[in-house]
Amino acid sequence: MISSNDFRPGVSIVLDGSVWRVLEFLHVKPGKGSAFVRTKLKNVQSGSVMEKTFRAGETVPQATLEKSTMQHTYKEGDEFVFMDMETYEEGRLTRTQIGDRVKYLKEGMEAEVIKWGDQVLGVELPKSVVLEIVQTDPGLKGDTATGGSKPATLETGAIVMVPLFISQGERIKVDTQEDKYISRE
């Protein structure tokens, strides 16, 4: 059990049989009445976001999540096969279990698989990945009317905005959280 006074971003709690992660919290102490904690929660399974208010000091069950490092070995149909790096056991995850970050998933990449009991909740990819550009328009000298960036398609199918000097075939580092170009590799 965890008290609402101990909520911090990243803390996982159980509400109505689902795991929710605290995104934001605000401890409010009005001049009249009792204090309360206003939170913004994200459902780890579905990705939906809701706002919920708790009384100050109210206790809720805390979710104990297990993280294990697994390597993406191959894709079979609509399933992604991962291998546990310690036990060498294989596990299969669907596109919905991985979420929208699937566009950065590449064979041989290591990721943190998050489990709650026997249930797989999702996958945390590394903060940044290095991928090759398979298609982008050539950047013309003096063509900065569009803000100095252009779309580029990566080897995994993801599309990110890159500076004009980046060309097809180059390897770039991409922030998987913000969907942004970081640097050239």
Curated annotation (Swiss-Prot):
Transmembrane segments: none annotated. Pathway: Protein biosynthesis; polypeptide chain elongation. GO terms for biological process: peptide biosynthetic process. GO terms for molecular function: translation elongation factor activity. GO terms for cellular component: cytoplasm. PROSITE patterns: EFP. The keyword Nucleotide-binding does not apply. It is found in: Cytoplasm. InterPro entries: Elong-fact-P_C (IPR015365), NA-bd_OB-fold (IPR012340), Rib_uL2_dom2 (IPR014722), Transl_elong_fac_P/YeiP (IPR020599), Transl_elong_KOW-like (IPR013185), Transl_elong_P/YeiP_cen (IPR001059), Transl_elong_P/YeiP_CS (IPR013852), Transl_elongation_fac_P (IPR011768). Involved in peptide bond synthesis. Stimulates efficient translation and peptide-bond synthesis on native or reconstituted 70S ribosomes in vitro. Probably functions indirectly by altering the affinity of the ribosome for aminoacyl-tRNA, thus increasing their reactivity as acceptors for peptidyl transferase. This is Elongation factor P.
